[in-house]
A protein has these predicted regions:
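Short, surface-exposed ligand-recognition loops at beta-strand->loop->(often short) alpha-helix junctions
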Residues: 44
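N-terminal intrinsically disordered, cationic/polar leader segments
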Residues: 1-36, 47, 51-114
Length: 114
């Protein structure tokens, strides 16, 4: 299962995200290796968000990814500008859509104040 934790600051603004695990969707649906749809979608959305924040905004952040474990950490290191906040919120929106489509056996999303 993929576990997503959205980090929320004291102003109730999303300020980061932690993603870990593997969905197991391919195994459950008897797909062949390489057809892990849920993991691929989550990875594509997360990496696109981080690359977009870097390319299109001036908001500093820290990011780390471990391919084998499926771990992805992203956090703004100062208050996000409007563009950066929109990109993070767009990622969260996409992850919520994946959760709605494929269900909680494959992806869970929670929020944590930091």
């Amino acid at each position: 299962m993929i576990q997503v934790t959205v980090l929320v600051d004291s102003k109730q603004q999303n300020c980061g995200i932690l993603i870990s695990g593997h969905a197991g969707y391919a195994e459950a649906e008897r797909y062949q290796k390489g057809q892990e749809l849920v993991c691929a979608a989550v990875s594509a959305l997360a990496l696109n968000m981080a690359n977009s924040v870097e390319h299109f905004t001036d908001t500093p952040f820290q990011a780390d990814m471990e391919e084998e474990s499926g771990m992805f950490c992203f956090r703004f290191t100062q208050e996000a500008d409007a563009k950066a906040a929109l990109l993070l919120n767009s990622l969260i929106f996409g992850l919520l859509d994946i959760q709605e489509e494929y269900g909680e056996p494959y992806i869970t999303i929670c929020y944590k104040e930091v």
